[in-house]
């Protein structure tokens, strides 16, 4: 789903490019992330012929296909890869700016190589400029504090370690509006430093 959203000279890498992969696996592609069509549930499957057929059999018995207009819109997107390149450029630009703001606040974070998510270890504490210290036992606690106290939406990601996830999919009309959003995040975090 994210294969086309890569940055900084990285090239999309297909599982099927691995020698022998076509003999043992399949790859699912979707319009949801590459073309900002989340929820449209349209894509395709490639790979091992037997597995593709088995996947088709499951799909035949679980749903009845997509509305033709969605299929046509998806086909248009696949014929226009520049759409994904434009989206990736936008997300890369936003990611660069968000990383700088988060690093200023003490987050240990680097730009990801792709997608629109920015994962990072959860802070153990936040220290306000007045000296007040707030401790977080995990990403869930930090995420809840960020939404309640700073009105910044994140997703806790505590499956492997205490972590949170930011996204650069926020609504913005143009690059100036993106800068406004990033500046607002910076302003909301300006009176706190995070400890790890």
Predicted regions and their residues:
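PLP-dependent class I/II
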Residues: 1-196
């Amino acid at each position: 789903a994210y294969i086309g959203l890569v940055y900084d000279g990285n090239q999309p890498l297909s599982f099927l490019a691995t020698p022998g992969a076509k003999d043992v696996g399949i790859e699912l592609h979707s319009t949801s992330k590459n073309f900002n069509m989340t929820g449209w549930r349209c894509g395709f499957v490639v790979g091992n012929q037997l597995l593709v057929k088995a996947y088709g059999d499951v799909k035949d018995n679980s749903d009845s296909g997509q509305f033709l207009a969605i299929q046509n819109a998806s086909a248009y997107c696949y014929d226009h890869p520049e759409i994904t390149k434009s989206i990736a450029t936008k997300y890369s630009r936003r990611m660069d700016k968000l990383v700088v703001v988060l690093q200023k606040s003490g987050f240990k974070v680097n730009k990801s190589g792709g997608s629109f998510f920015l994962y990072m270890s959860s802070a153990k504490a936040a220290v306000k400029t007045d000296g007040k210290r707030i401790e977080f036992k995990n990403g869930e606690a930090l995420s809840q504090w960020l939404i309640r106290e700073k009105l910044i939406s994140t997703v806790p990601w505590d499956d492997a370690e205490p972590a949170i996830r930011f996204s650069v999919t926020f609504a913005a009309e143009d690059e100036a509006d993106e800068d406004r959003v990033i500046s607002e995040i910076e302003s909301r975090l300006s009176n706190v430093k995070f400890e790890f």
